[in-house]
């Protein structure tokens, strides 16, 4: 059970796409997918919301370790699991990576790179809401 929830809704990307996104972090693939062209639906980090077709990324945090919930994710129909160590006895492919948090970022980066639009971030302690509302008004007037 992680505090974070789903991240990346997929347009049904393939297992092969996922392997390519993780290539810099991937150590091994444990278990075979039924088909490399089989597709997943979304990426999640909270085992409580896993649905059939989801990729579950097991993140380790201060309070809990997502690896404790691999069985729950598998039983909920996870398409595959992104893990730092293999959990035996699960009938779902496990993509073993050096660091699951970094792998999570690689998946997000690969997804984001599919789109050729600019991305802007607003950070800081004060004024974020005002700044984003002003940006929205300016951009809406132009587009």
Across the structure, where does each feature detected by a protein language model lie?
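Phosphate-binding loop of NTP-binding sites
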Residues: 96, 103-143
